[in-house]
């Protein structure tokens, strides 16, 4: 009898213990489910917020691009007719910076779509500076001026672009101290200049200052330097050397 009562007590004890553990597991599972769903909602909210932020940034980016494109288009459409008055207006945009260094620029002539410009003052005494100034002037005039048929003008800087003896020697003036040191001089023996700017050529010869009949040998790198400088100013010019 005692044995039966003891067995019943043990059975009841294990029954309540299992019931308690099952309830605890259910509660834990419920909590875990809540935590999982909560984290999922938070992550979803974060992803959605990130997507919304990205969308706004993309819209702003496209908006900026549209504004930039519109401004560029407006600048491209701002053109003046090719005539002396409008050319002077555009040159006035450049003059203040040139005049700071005692330089200037002037309109020489307009023939059809050809625009002839001359550099003045310090603009032509420094060869490296004159090349830069020429490029700026050409770019600015082509940006704002349009000739017949809405074409960009053919800007000709007569100090450099016209092929003649004076301009060729001016282009090489920086090398004169070197020639003086070697006691030689550079002479233009022959020059061909076509108005069509084709088959233009120049024949150069080096002569000894003290004795012109004396043979002169010039290093190849000096000839290369001379050719490079002339081709930079006169792209259509073929440079030849007699000696």
Swiss-Prot record:
InterPro entries: FSCA_dom_sf, NIF_FeS_clus_asmbl_NifU_C. One of its GO terms (cellular component) is apicoplast. Pathway: Cofactor biosynthesis; iron-sulfur cluster biosynthesis. Homodimer. Pfam families: NifU. Binds and transfers [4Fe-4S] iron-sulfur clusters to target proteins. GO terms for molecular function: 4 iron, 4 sulfur cluster binding; iron ion binding. Its main location: plastid. Keywords: 4Fe-4S, Apicoplast, Iron, Iron-sulfur, Metal-binding, Plastid. This is NifU-like scaffold protein. It comes from the Eukaryota. One of its GO terms (biological process) is iron-sulfur cluster assembly. Belongs to the NifU family. It is found in: Plastid, Apicoplast. Disruption phenotype: Disruption affects formation of merosomes, merozoite-filled vesicles budding from mature liver stage parasites. No significant effect on life cycle progression. No significant effect on the numbers of liver stage parasites. No significant effect on infectivity in mosquito and number of mosquito midgut- and salivary gland-associated sporozoites. No significant effect on the initiation of a blood stage infection. Non-significant delay in blood stage expansion.
